[in-house]
Regions:
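Alpha-helical membrane segments and immediately flanking helix-loop junctions
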Residues: 57-114, 208-262
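Hydrophobic alpha-helical transmembrane segments
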Residues: 32-42, 61-77, 120-129, 158-165, ...
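Hydrophobic faces of alpha-helical transmembrane segments in multi-pass integral membrane proteins
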Residues: 22, 26, 30, 66, ...
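Extracellular/periplasmic helix-loop-helix junctions in multi-pass membrane proteins
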Residues: 262-274
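Helix-coil boundary and interhelical linker segments in multi-pass alpha-helical membrane proteins
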Residues: 36, 80-87, 140-141, 267
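Membrane-interface capping segments at transmembrane-helix boundaries
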Residues: 288-301
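Selected transmembrane alpha-helices and immediately adjacent juxtamembrane segments
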Residues: 1-50, 126-205, 274, 278, ...
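Short loop segments and helix-boundary regions at transmembrane helix junctions
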Residues: 113-121
C-alpha cells in the first residue's frame, strides 16, 4: 500500500504543481500589472456593488471572478498582492470555499443528475448565506484581530520600482515564491489524500455505505472524487441519497486543501471549516428528512 500511496502522490503532485504554476504566475502578474498601471480601480468599480455586499475592497472583484469560474489558486494569485486583513481573507475564503471552479464542478454534478441551474443558484445563495454572520455581526465577534494583516509581505507596492523592467522582474520572482509556497502546502495535503484514497474502505466500497463513502471522499479530497464515487455507486442509491450527498458536497468539500490555502494568509481556520460543515449538515438533514422520493423512483438508475 505504501508504494501505491507514493506513486499516486507523485502523479498527483506533479500534475497539481503544473496547474498551480500555470494558474498562479499569470494571474499574479496580471493583478500586479493592473495595479502598476493604475487600471485596477476602473475594473474593480464595475464589481463594486458585489464586493460591497461582502464587505470586501473593490479590488478583490478579480479574485472572486477567478475563483468562481476557475479555481482557488487563481483567486489567491489575484488576492495575494492586495494586502488584505484577516477579516477580509476569512470572508473571501468562506465565500469561495462554497462557490468556486463552477465551470468544471457544475458539469460533473450534471452527470449525476443535478441540473445546472440548481447547482449554480444553490451555491450562489449558500455562499452568501455562509458569510452573512461575518457581515451582519461585528468583526470581532468571530475574529480576535480582524484588522491585522497576517502577511505584510504582500502589501501593495506600486511606487517602489525604478522602471518597468524592475517591476516585472520583482513581480515575476514574487509570483514564483508564492507558487512554490502553495505547491509545498498542497503537496503535503496531497500526500495525506493519496493515503486516504488508498484506504481499503474507499477502494472496495460496500454498496450499503456508498452514501457515507461519497460524502467522506468529497469532504476530505474534493467534489470531483466524491462525485466519482457517486457515479460508480449511483445504481445502488436512492435519489434522496444522491441529492443529499451532492448538496452536502456543494456546501463543504476539499475541507483541508481549500481551507489551508486561505489560512496561510491569515483566514480563521475554525470559521472556514465549521461554518461550511454546519451548513452542510443542516442541508443534508433537511433533504433526508423532508425530501419525498417518488414511488416509481425508489432507486436511482
Amino acid at each position: 500500500m505504501t508504494s501505491q500511496v507514493f506513486r499516486d502522490f507523485k502523479k498527483s503532485s506533479i500534475s497539481t504543481s503544473k496547474i498551480i504554476l500555470i494558474m498562479v504566475i499569470p494571474y499574479y502578474l496580471l493583478a500586479e500589472l493592473l495595479i502598476y498601471f493604475e487600471l485596477m480601480p476602473y475594473i474593480a468599480g464595475i464589481f463594486s456593488p458585489f464586493t460591497e455586499l461582502l464587505n470586501l475592497p473593490p479590488e478583490t472583484s478579480l479574485a472572486i471572478a477567478a475563483g468562481v469560474f476557475f479555481n482557488l489558486y487563481a483567486a489567491v494569485a489575484f488576492a495575494a498582492p492586495l494586502g488584505m486583513n484577516i477579516y477580509e481573507w476569512t470572508i473571501l475564503g468562506l465565500f469561495l470555499g462554497v462557490l468556486h471552479n463552477m465551470l468544471v464542478e457544475v458539469s460533473i454534478l450534471k452527470k449525476i443528475g443535478i441540473p445546472v441551474v440548481t447547482s449554480v443558484s444553490y451555491r450562489f445563495l449558500m455562499a452568501f448565506f455562509a458569510v452573512s454572520p461575518l457581515i451582519l455581526l461585528p468583526k470581532n465577534f468571530f475574529l480576535s484581530n480582524p484588522d491585522s494583516i497576517f502577511k505584510p509581505l504582500y502589501e501593495i507596492k506600486v511606487k517602489n520600482y525604478e522602471n518597468f523592467m524592475s517591476f516585472f522582474t520583482n513581480t515575476f520572482f514574487d509570483s514564483l515564491i508564492l507558487s512554490v509556497q502553495i505547491i509545498i502546502l498542497v503537496s503535503l495535503v496531497l500526500l495525506m489524500t493519496s493515503f486516504i484514497k488508498n484506504l481499503s474502505f474507499l477502494k472496495k466500497i460496500n454498496h450499503q455505505v456508498a452514501l457515507t463513502s461519497s460524502i467522506l471522499s468529497g469532504l476530505l479530497i474534493g467534489i470531483v472524487y466524491g462525485a466519482g464515487v457517486l457515479l460508480s455507486e449511483a445504481k445502488y442509491m436512492t435519489k434522496k441519497q444522491i441529492y443529499s450527498s451532492c448538496f452536502f458536497l456543494m456546501t463543504a468539500h476539499a475541507i483541508i486543501e481549500d481551507t489551508l490555502l486561505f489560512v496561510y494568509f491569515g483566514a480563521n481556520v475554525w470559521v472556514l471549516t465549521l461554518f461550511r460543515l454546519f451548513l452542510a449538515i443542516i442541508v443534508f438533514y433537511l433533504i433526508m428528512t423532508f425530501y419525498q422520493t417518488p414511488v416509481i423512483d425508489k432507486q436511482y438508475h
